[in-house]
Design a protein with these regions (language model features):
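Feature of extramembrane
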Residues: 1-167
Length: 169
């Protein structure tokens, strides 16, 4: 029973590193590329934000909201290339396809830190709180955030099961 005290302290104070890239050697081109992105361009991660059934003016307001979130360096969208008053039918098809598909439009949120950094995952969480329904944040940073949240949600269950099984033995 006494061993549960240090086990509990260890459980509470142990931090899980979700940054898979931190385990790779510095000599890999992926690591070098990410370091260059962060050091020279001030960004290392991105997320695609898909917006469905939203008028252009509201999407422009949403873009501004996303840009105001901590650690979101920039948000790229249609209005960065063309004013929203220009009908989408007037722009070249390749540009239109890059931003629109049916009633959905895509924005690209650029973060000032790496894919699995705590600041990036916090920004993804904030984006998901701000956007509401019919807006979806995806990409590797979104996946890592989801994995982290699932692990944190399920870990107490596994710890309790392990504790009960150890009492049986």
């Amino acid at each position: 029973f006494i061993l549960l005290i240090p086990a509990g302290i260890g459980y509470v104070s142990t931090r899980v590193n979700y940054d898979v890239l931190s385990y790779l050697p510095e000599s890999l081109e992926t690591i070098k590329g990410q370091d260059i992105l962060v050091d020279e361009f001030g960004m290392g991660a991105f997320s695609m934000v898909v917006v469905e059934d939203m008028p252009m003016k509201d999407a422009a307001k949403l873009e501004e909201q996303l840009e105001s979130i901590d650690h979101v360096k920039d948000v790229l969208w249609y209005d960065d290339a063309v004013d929203i008053s220009v009908p989408t039918e007037m722009i070249p098809e390749d540009l239109r396809k890059a931003f629109f598909n049916g009633k959905a439009t895509m924005m690209i949120a650029l973060f000032d830190d790496t894919t699995s950094a705590d600041d990036t995952m916090d920004a993804i969480t904030q984006i998901r709180k701000v956007v509401g329904k019919n807006v979806y944040a995806s990409g590797m940073s979104g996946v890592v955030t989801d994995i982290k949240n699932l692990a944190l949600q399920e870990m107490p269950i596994y710890v309790v099961i392990a504790g009960l099984l150890s009492l049986v033995v």
